[in-house]
């Protein structure tokens, strides 16, 4: 950690010494409705990139210590037209009038599930411009990598294909993701498979990341974080964009976007087509990803209707297996022992011994691929019932279907419900074969919210939703060297998962005084989950589970001064186990629902060239389902309940306008993530059963105690930006034993990004972008897993997912 803090401070000192101080200004005024003259509390007033405030109960605001180079104030309020006021002509004490939007704004759709400075919760907003700077083909987890407390992972090692995300150490199954307020997480696994939505960032208008329990939302409740995405962006004028990028590992992205603008003063149509492809850093880990986005909107004076459809289709060569520790370290003796322990055949043994230490891929069959298509249909509506009340009603259908194909060497016929083959006097019980494991599902439902704004002290929302997931899981044998009595596409397992989810919530903000406001939020959520049939291990699965949860939240926000605020919140979240928690559990030990009590407290200050915030959190868990470090045969993590555990830490964020040319954004998380008393169960093949090992208090797996992100930008002219992006992630244990021999080592990476914006006569804008990732070629892994057993002694197998060394991406965006 010392080297990263020294490095970041050196950067700051280098650019800061001798730079001139800019003059400071104060701006104050009142925001009102242009027709009624009603003050607008909670309006946002921004001055430049880092400074901003919200109006108090009487619509008044004060901004102090604003640098002299801030040219305008920007005022926004949901349902109103944005106003920009030149600072050169601004008089303190002025009244700024906002006009109601002629059209119901798209932003009201996500307003009920988002938070703001009055909520008392930790959050980060990421706009379309910030995403566009980084978007050269890598997935959304990689684009969000420099937000606080976030760690991204990539199976293929280059940010394309299967990627993952953890926030505060919590994995993707606990991170609630919504698109336009509609749940996106897979209801059974609770995970998010970003590979199914390639280049979705090109259609996103904004992302809000809420850390902790967050506000009540739709779908499986957040149990560590929420990623709230909106695609509904209103374009008044027609537009077209073409983006192409190319880079290392034959990575390329091609995107075409277009929109009609406002037709007949009522209608808009927006569309996008994308292709993303890469050979991957890992051997054979290629991806071929295609997607589209199509949206049609009707904008009336009181009503808004938008139909969205988008789809992603992926063909990805599997790299789920990871690389054995001995291969990563180049330990030949260790590899030979691994080959012997795991019974690798000659082909697989030679692949292990002769592959590059960092690009090894266990799979060699030429069609060992994941093939999946996911189609989304959303009907998003909003109607203004009165000047104070808005009703939003949405409906959605998600259709998913696909399979992954695997070559199996010398597998038992009985594993596929096939009898032995008799040839003469010879009995054949094993065969080489190719199997496909299918998912075929529908996910559909509705969400709603009724939003009330008194334009005085009270703002409130009542909302909720229901949804149903109906998914078939089945496996087929499509080829076998000895086919027994099977027919083509012989089905060897089949089960169905039916999950229903309903929730109802109520939220309110109340402005007690000019300085003090409060937030309250209560939610009731009910879940039923039924699985029937046999799974891919030929185990009969027959369970019917129901859960009812009550999730209250409260928060306070107090304005200490014109420039600073303090806040605190307390939230309770509950969550049901996912599919694998049930199917991988023993009959004696069934998974239980988890409970999280989340305390957040923080401080925000903005003064002149500096913006700073500090957030403390204490996440106290009961029966937390923690990752054991083991994965199943498709790379999904296995979890187990632990009675008592917690995560506590402090998140620091800062932004500094060092001069007109230099800007620095940085964030750091320092945390402790502990299980009160962890017992490890090790399979004992020598004696049967398990050996129990009590480790006492341990660290939670995959939870680094230190995460640091930095973006240092140099802007020599208004059209050119050069940014150094730095990320430090501390040690992560692969399981919950705190064993130093089972961990991912800390790593520090540096990326360099260049952007040059041109405005030729034939185009609105031409953007030339270049990104050099890992410029110092840090040797590191971002993910891994482990498992152990006893067979002639204790054996522990560690696997890692190595990431690429220095690599680059170059792109050109044309806007018309």
List the predicted regions and their residue ranges.
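Short acidic/polar hinge/loop motifs at secondary-structure boundaries
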Residues: 62-64, 183-211, 230, 327
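C-terminal beta-signal and adjacent terminal beta-strands/loops
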Residues: 664-667, 672-674, 728-733, 756-816
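Membrane-embedded beta-barrel scaffold of Gram-negative outer-membrane proteins
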Residues: 388-396, 557-559, 565-571, 592-648, ...
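Gram-negative outer-membrane beta-barrel transporters
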Residues: 514, 618-620, 640-736
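Transmembrane beta-barrel wall of Gram-negative outer-membrane proteins
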Residues: 239, 246-277, 282-321, 326-330, ...
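Short, acidic, small-residue-rich periplasmic hinge/interaction motif at the N-terminus
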Residues: 32-36, 43-46, 74-80, 90-133, ...
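A beta-strand signature from Gram-negative outer-membrane beta-barrel systems
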Residues: 96, 198-241, 253
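Extracytoplasmic beta-strand/coil segments of soluble accessory domains associated
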Residues: 141-183, 205
């Amino acid at each position: 950690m010392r080297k990263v803090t020294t490095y970041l401070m050196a950067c700051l000192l280098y650019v800061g010494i001798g730079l001139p101080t800019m003059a400071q200004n104060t701006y104050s005024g009142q925001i009102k409705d242009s027709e009624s003259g009603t003050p607008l509390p909670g309006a946002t007033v921004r001055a430049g990139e880092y400074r901003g405030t919200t109006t108090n109960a009487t619509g008044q605001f004060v901004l102090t210590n604003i640098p002299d180079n801030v040219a305008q104030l920007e005022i926004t309020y949901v349902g109103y037209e944005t106003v920009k006021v030149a600072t050169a002509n601004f008089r303190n004490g002025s009244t700024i009038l906002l006009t109601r939007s002629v059209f119901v704004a798209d932003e009201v759709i996500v307003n009920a599930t988002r938070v703001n400075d009055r909520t008392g919760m930790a959050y980060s907003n990421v706009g379309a411009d910030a995403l566009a700077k980084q978007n050269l083909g890598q997935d959304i987890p990689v684009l969000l990598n420099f937000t606080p407390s976030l760690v991204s992972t990539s199976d293929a090692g280059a940010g394309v294909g299967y990627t993952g995300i953890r926030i505060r150490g919590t994995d993707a199954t606990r991170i609630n993701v919504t698109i336009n307020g509609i749940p996106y997480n897979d209801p059974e696994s609770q995970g998010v498979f970003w590979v199914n939505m390639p280049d979705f960032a090109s259609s996103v208008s904004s992302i809000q990341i809420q850390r902790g329990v967050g506000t009540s939302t739709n779908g499986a409740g957040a149990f560590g974080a929420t990623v709230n995405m909106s695609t509904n962006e209103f374009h008044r004028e027609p537009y077209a964009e073409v983006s192409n990028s190319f880079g290392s590992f034959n990575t390329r992205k091609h995107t075409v976007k277009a929109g009609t603008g406002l037709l007949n003063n009522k209608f808009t149509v927006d569309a996008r087509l994308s292709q993303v492809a890469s050979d991957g850093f890992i051997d054979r880990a290629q991806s071929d990803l295609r997607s589209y986005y199509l949206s049609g909107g009707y904008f009336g004076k009181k009503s808004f209707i938008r139909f969205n459809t988008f789809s992603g289709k992926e063909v990805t060569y599997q790299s789920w297996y990871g690389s054995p520790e001995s291969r990563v370290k180049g330990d030949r003796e260790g590899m030979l022992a691994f080959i012997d322990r795991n019974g690798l055949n000659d082909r697989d043994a030679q692949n292990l011994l002769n592959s590059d230490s960092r690009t090894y891929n266990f799979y060699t069959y030429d069609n060992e691929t994941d093939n999946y298509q996911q189609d989304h249909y959303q009907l998003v509506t909003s109607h203004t019932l009165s000047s104070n009340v808005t009703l939003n009603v949405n409906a959605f259908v998600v259709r998913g279907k696909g399979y992954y194909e695997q070559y199996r060497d010398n597998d038992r016929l009985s594993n596929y419900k096939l009898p032995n083959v008799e040839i003469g006097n010879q009995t054949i019980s094993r065969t080489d074969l190719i199997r496909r494991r299918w998912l075929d599902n529908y996910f559909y439902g509705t969400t709603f919210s009724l939003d009330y704004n008194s334009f005085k002290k009270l703002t409130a929302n009542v909302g909720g939703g229901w949804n149903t997931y109906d998914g078939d899981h089945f496996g087929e044998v499509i080829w076998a060297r000895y086919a027994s009595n099977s027919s083509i596409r012989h089905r060897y397992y089949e089960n169905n998962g039916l999950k229903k989810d309903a929730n109802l919530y109520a939220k309110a903000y109340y402005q007690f005084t000019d300085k003090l406001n409060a937030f309250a939020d209560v939610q009731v959520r009910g879940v039923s989950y039924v699985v029937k049939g046999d799974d891919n291990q030929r185990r009969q699965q027959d369970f019917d589970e129901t859960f009812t949860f009550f999730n209250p939240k409260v928060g306070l926000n107090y304005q200490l001064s014109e420039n600073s605020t303090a806040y605190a919140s307390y939230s309770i979240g509950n969550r049901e186990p996912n599919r694998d928690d049930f199917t991988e559990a023993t009959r004696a030990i069934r998974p239980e629902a988890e409970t999280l009590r989340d305390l957040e407290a923080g401080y925000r200050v903005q003064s002149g060239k500096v913006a700073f915030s500090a957030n403390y959190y204490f996440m106290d868990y009961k029966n937390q389902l923690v990752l054991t470090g083991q994965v199943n045969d498709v790379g999904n993590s296995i979890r187990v309940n632990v009675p008592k555990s917690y995560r506590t830490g402090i998140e620091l964020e800062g932004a500094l306008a060092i001069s007109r040319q230099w800007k620095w954004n940085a964030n750091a998380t320092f945390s402790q993530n502990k299980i009160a008393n962890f017992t490890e169960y090790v399979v004992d093949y020598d004696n049967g059963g398990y050996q129990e090992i009590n480790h006492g208090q341990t660290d939670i797996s995959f939870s680094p105690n230190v995460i640091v992100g930095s973006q240092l930008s140099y802007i020599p002219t208004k059209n050119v930006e050069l940014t150094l992006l730095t990320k430090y992630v501390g040690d992560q244990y692969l399981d919950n034993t705190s064993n130093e021999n089972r961990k991912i080592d800390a790593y520090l990476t540096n990326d360099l990004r260049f952007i040059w914006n041109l405005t030729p006569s034939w185009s609105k804008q031409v953007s030339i972008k270049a990104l050099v990732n890992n410029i110092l070629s840090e040797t590191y892994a971002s993910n891994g897993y482990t498992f152990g057993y006893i067979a002639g002694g204790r054996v522990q197998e560690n696997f890692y997912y190595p990431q690429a060394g220095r690599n680059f991406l170059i792109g050109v965006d044309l806007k018309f």
